[in-house]
Design a protein with these regions (language model features):
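...with weaker cross-activation on analogous glycine-rich loops/strands in unrelated enzymes
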Residues: 209-240
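Solvent-exposed loop/turn segments at secondary-structure junctions
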Residues: 164-165, 211-213, 236, 254-256
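Acidic, glycine-rich loop-and-strand cores that form catalytic or ligand-binding grooves
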Residues: 182-212, 219
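Extracellular/periplasmic catalytic domains that process cell-envelope and extracellular macromolecules
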Residues: 116-118, 150-152, 197-199, 221-223, ...
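Active-site scaffold segments
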Residues: 175, 228-232, 237-270
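Near-N-terminal "mature-domain entry" segment
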Residues: 30-184, 188-192, 257-273, 277-287
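Active-site-proximal beta-strand/loop segments in catalytic clefts of secreted hydrolases
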Residues: 128, 160, 207-209, 232, ...
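N-terminal secretory signal peptides
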Residues: 1-37, 48-50
Length: 287
C-alpha cells in the first residue's frame, strides 16, 4: 500500500516522522491573528506582572527556611521530589482540538488473530514482588477499569513507518488505575516518591492474551499523565482491529508501544522483552 504522506516505503525500517501538511492560511489572516495575539499577550502579561508583585511581597514577608521564603521552599521541595523521582526527562505531548481528529488506519495484527470472548476477557495484573517471593495476581473486568476517572485527549499518533494521525482517545490513566489498585509497589502502597525507591517496580510489561505481541515500558512512561488504558477512539468504543477491549495509548512514544488488546500487565525489576525491540527497533521508541 502506498501512503501519499510518507516518502519512505513501509518496509524500509525506521523512518523519521514527517510534519503533516496543514491547511494553507493567507498571509493576511496570519498577520491579523498575530496582531490579536500581541494585544492579548500585553494584557495577560500585565495581569501576570501585577499578580507577581503582590505574590512576591507575600513571599518576602514569609519566614525564611534555608535562605528561601518558607512557602517557596516547601513547594520547591515537593515538586523537586516528584520531578526527580518520576518525570526527570518528561514533557507533555501536544493536545489538539477534538475537531482535528481523523480516522486512524488499522496497522498491525499481532496478538489479535484469535477470537476474543468478550465475556471471558479479564485484565490480569501481576503486582511487583520482591525477588524470591510470589507476585500477587489480580483480575479486572472492563467495567472496573471504566469505573475509574475517564480522561479524554486528542493527540498525534505517530507510526515509526513515517505516517501520523490526530486521534481522540478516552480511557483511564494507568497512574489512576495504580492509585486505586497499588500493584506497582512491593509494599502494596500507592506510588509515592517518599517511599524507598526500591519499593517501585522499574519496568512494566504488557502482553496480549495470546502472548504474540508484547511491549515493555519504563515505570516513568507508565506513570506519565498521558499514558492511558484506552477503551474509546474518536468518540466510539474501540473496535477489535484497534485493540478492543483495552489498549495502551502513550503519545510520547511511537505506535509500536501502543499495544492493542492488553491481556496481562506485569510490574517487574528487569527490562521486559518488547516485540519490536527484539526486531532491532529502539526499546524506548520515544519521539
Ligand atoms: N496487539 C498489537 N498491538 C499493536 C500492534 C500489533 O501488531 N499488535 N502494532 C502496533 C503498531 S506498529 C501500530 S502503528 C499501532 C497501530 O494501531 P492502530 O491499528 O489502531 O492504528 O498498533 C500497535 N499495537
Ligand atoms: Mo507502527
Amino acid at each position: 500500500m502506498a501512503y501519499p504522506e510518507s516518502s519512505q516505503p513501509a518496509a524500509s525500517g525506521p523512518a523519521l516522522p514527517e510534519s503533516q501538511p496543514t491547511t494553507p492560511v493567507s498571509d493576511e489572516a496570519v498577520e491579523r491573528q498575530a496582531a490579536r495575539r500581541t494585544r492579548r499577550a500585553f494584557l495577560v502579561g500585565g495581569v501576570a506582572a501585577l499578580a507577581g508583585i503582590v505574590g512576591w511581597n507575600w513571599l518576602l514577608d514569609a519566614p525564611q527556611e534555608d535562605g528561601l521564603a518558607g512557602p517557596l521552599r516547601r513547594v520547591l521541595d515537593a515538586n523537586g521530589r516528584l520531578a526527580t523521582a518520576y518525570f526527570r526527562n518528561t514533557r507533555l505531548a501536544t493536545e489538539f482540538p477534538k475537531s482535528h481528529a481523523k480516522p486512524l488506519r488499522k496497522n498491525g495484527t499481532e496478538g489479535l488473530k484469535s477470537a476474543l470472548g468478550a465475556v471471558a476477557w479479564r485484565l490480569q495484573v501481576q503486582g511487583y514482588a520482591p525477588a524470591g517471593t510470589t507476585p500477587r495476581m489480580q483480575e479486572f473486568t472492563l467495567d472496573e477499569v471504566k469505573a475509574l476517572p475517564r480522561v479524554e485527549m486528542t493527540t498525534e499518533f505517530k507510526c515509526i513507518e513515517g505516517w501520523s494521525t490526530i486521534v481522540t482517545w478516552a480511557g483511564t490513566r494507568l497512574s489512576d488505575f495504580l492509585a486505586k489498585y497499588p500493584l506497582a509497589t512491593s509494599s502494596g502502597r500507592p506510588v509515592d516518591p517518599n517511599n524507598p525507591p526500591t519499593d517501585l517496580a522499574p519496568y512494566v510489561s504488557l502482553v496480549t492474551p495470546d502472548k504474540e505481541y508484547y511491549v515493555g515500558l519504563e515505570i516513568e512512561s507508565a506513570l506519565h499523565p498521558q499514558t492511558l488504558l484506552c477503551y474509546e477512539m474518536n468518540g466510539a468504543p474501540l473496535t477489535p482491529e484497534h485493540g478492543a477491549p483495552l489498549r495502551l495509548v502513550t503519545p510520547l512514544k511511537y505506535g509500536i508501544k501502543h499495544i492493542k488488546r492488553i491481556g496481562t500487565i506485569a510490574f517487574l525489576d528487569q527490562r521486559p522483552p518488547d516485540y519490536w525491540a527484539v526486531r532491532g527497533y529502539d526499546w524506548h521508541a520515544g519521539h
